[in-house]
């Protein structure tokens, strides 16, 4: 106890095994011999009472006494060597004098000193604490800078992560007249168009979460949160035939989607082009034209541009020798009912199937047209009476499927030569979005979603060249039956419309998954060439800041526009034919029916029997193992 003093630093061992320094604040002598120590821990001060034995054990450097002098040590350690009994007898007889042997002094080993280890551990903890504080300071500084870059934006963190993500993308977008490549025209084409933000959305500081790095790919940045509430981006990548950004006009969209189908109908085929997407995503704008005011202008819609190209193609060689006439019809499908938009009063029509299994819309008018101006008049008449309503997503939402058909007939016998169906589908809706709407609006949404589901199944069956098409599932597919049946004479183009807003990200993903599902099951698709979504899984703010600038973004490939699809499809067809051949029932073996044949067979030589057996085995293998 004499070597200890108040405010002296000593090492102590905690109950969990930790060893650190503590300060003596009280010494109790007598029988108890307790030492009271305390030490700071975080924002508090802790204390403990220790017996003297533990203090001595943990601090041997304090209680080590100085070594004795050499003479005393030598005298203390000198001992007489004890001889064995024979040795004692020899000493007693005087034959051997006693010899004092000095034992070598024992080496005193100092207890291990833990001072260096504890000091290093404390230094390491201090450095880690400083690094954490520096990282927290940098994070606070980054947050302040992010707020200052986009003041007043409640989603500034998401906006910054998306901005940093887009800086790593190389943009190569579709532009009208800037490419010399051949426009792909497959049996099923799927294109996506992203609409720009509206003025109201810009005023509300809506965030654009859709990026288009190339003319075939797009990425949807979905904001998510970890368990610890740290925000991050989950990037969903898609690949289609063509992707149009918000700067593309209707003319550019038409050039890559519907225009390649004009030549197909003049060659005697059936073509279908339809716009699909969430309500308010721009389907009617794309198909019908702009809205300069309350009324729609049909001058720059796909309807009018297709009609203009039809009349211009009609005058070119060799189609001018076919002597074709152009007819137009315009009708809508509201729920399960069909209405003619070109007749006064918009009468309801019946959809029936004749004896030739051809679906006929009874009473539908097909007006003959001579030029584009007459087509525009019909479009304005039909758009003025089309059914629309108010929803939570769009103040003027189309509640029906509008079908505008351009029909080519021969002038001699009025025989159908080709048909082009341009469809403005009603917007798909979720039940959670219109749960507060009235019963009629919910029923409309239910019928719309049902018809869109059947439409997708018909397109998938068309892509698989299936013998069964579920076109009777809805009035829409029933009316368009001749646009799905016909093999290579039928071509379809789908324009998926998406909204870039943050609050519509779920609708956008549903639309893109719908379109991708249609595309990936087509005949010419190449599933084996799907590339992995490298560096596109999920990205947090810290990951984006630390990422290298050489990060690449290559989304999945599930498109029929990729090269080599035809060979893959041919190989698939050959394999299917081989399987069909192998599954054909083999012919029954023939047996001799008369005794004469049995005698003849018994009388044949062994060589002939062996040859017959070999031939039979070869025929069996040829039938079952081509």
Swiss-Prot record:
Naturally occurring in which organism (per UniProt): Drosophila melanogaster (Fruit fly)
Protein name in the entry: Kinesin-like protein Klp59C
Keyword ATP-binding: yes
Subcellular location: Chromosome, Centromere; Chromosome, Centromere, Kinetochore; Cytoplasm, Cytoskeleton, Spindle pole
Biased composition (Low complexity): 101-112
Residue ranges of coiled coil: 115-150
Residue ranges with Polar residues bias: 72-96
Family per record: Belongs to the TRAFAC class myosin-kinesin ATPase superfamily. Kinesin family. MCAK/KIF2 subfamily.
Basic and acidic residues composition-biased segments: 113-150
């Amino acid at each position: 106890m004499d070597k200890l003093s108040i405010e002296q630093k000593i090492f102590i061992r905690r109950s969990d095994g930790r060893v650190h320094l503590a300060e003596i604040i009280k010494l109790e002598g007598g029988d108890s011999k307790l030492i009271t120590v305390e030490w700071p821990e975080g924002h508090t001060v802790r204390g403990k009472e220790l017996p003297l034995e533990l203090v001595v054990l943990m601090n041997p450097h304090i209680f080590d006494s100085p070594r004795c002098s050499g003479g005393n040590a030598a005298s203390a350690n000198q001992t007489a060597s004890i001889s064995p009994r024979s040795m004692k007898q020899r000493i007693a007889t005087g034959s051997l004098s006693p010899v004092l042997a000095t034992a070598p002094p024992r080496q005193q080993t100092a207890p291990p000193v833990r001072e260096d280890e504890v000091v290093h551990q404390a230094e390491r903890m201090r450095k880690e604490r400083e690094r954490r504080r520096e990282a927290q300071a940098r994070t606070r500084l980054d947050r302040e800078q992010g707020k200052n870059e986009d003041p007043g934006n409640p989603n500034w963190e998401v906006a910054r992560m998306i901005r940093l993500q887009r800086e790593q993308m190389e943009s190569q977008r579709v532009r009208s007249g800037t490419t010399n490549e051949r426009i792909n025209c497959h049996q099923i084409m799927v294109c996506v168009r992203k609409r720009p933000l509206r003025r109201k959305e810009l005023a509300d500081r809506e965030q654009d979460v859709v990026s288009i790095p190339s003319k075939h790919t797009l990425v949807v940045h979905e904001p998510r949160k970890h368990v610890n509430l740290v925000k991050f981006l989950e990037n969903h990548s898609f690949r289609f035939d063509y992707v149009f950004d918000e700067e593309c006009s209707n003319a550019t969209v038409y050039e890559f989607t519907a225009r390649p189908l004009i030549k197909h109908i003049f060659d005697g085929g059936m073509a279908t082009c339809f716009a699909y997407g969430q309500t308010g995503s721009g389907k009617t704008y794309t198909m019908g034209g702009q809205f300069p005011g309350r009324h729609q202008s049909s001058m720059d819609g796909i309807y009018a541009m297709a009609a203009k190209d039809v009349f211009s193609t009609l005058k070119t060689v060799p189609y001018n020798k076919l002597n074709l006439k152009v007819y137009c019809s315009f009708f809508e499908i509201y729920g399960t009912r069909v209405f003619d938009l070109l007749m006064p009063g918009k009468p309801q029509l019946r959809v029936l199937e004749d004896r030739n299994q051809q679906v006929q819309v009874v009473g539908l008018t097909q007006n003959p047209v001579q030029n584009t101006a007459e087509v525009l008049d019909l479009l304005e008449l039909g758009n003025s009476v089309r059914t629309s309503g108010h929803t939570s997503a769009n103040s003027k939402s189309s509640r029906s499927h509008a079908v505008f058909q351009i029909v080519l007939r021969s002038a001699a016998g009025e025989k159908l030569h080709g048909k082009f169906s341009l469809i403005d589908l009603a917007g798909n809706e979720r039940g959670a979005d219109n749960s507060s709407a009235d019963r009629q609006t919910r029923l409309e949404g239910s019928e719309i979603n049902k018809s869109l589901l059947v439409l997708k199944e018909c397109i998938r069956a068309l892509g698989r060249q299936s013998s069964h098409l579920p076109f009777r599932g809805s009035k829409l597919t029933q009316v368009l039956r001749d646009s799905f049946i016909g093999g290579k004479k039928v071509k379809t183009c789908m324009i998926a419309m998406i909204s870039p807003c943050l609050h519509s990200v779920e609708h956008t993903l549903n639309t893109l998954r719908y379109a991708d599902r249609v595309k990936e099951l087509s005949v010419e698709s190449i599933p084996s060439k799907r590339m992995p979504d490298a560096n596109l899984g999920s990205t947090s703010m810290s990951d984006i800041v630390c990422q290298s600038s050489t990060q690449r973004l290559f989304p999945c490939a599930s498109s029929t526009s990729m090269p080599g699809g035809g060979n893959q499809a041919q190989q698939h067809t050959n394999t299917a034919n081989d399987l069909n051949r192998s599954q054909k029932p083999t012919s029954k073996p023939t047996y001799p029916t008369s005794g004469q044949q049995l005698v003849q067979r018994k009388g044949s030589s062994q060589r002939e029997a062996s040859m017959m057996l070999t031939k039979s085995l070869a025929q069996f293998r040829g039938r079952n193992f081509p």
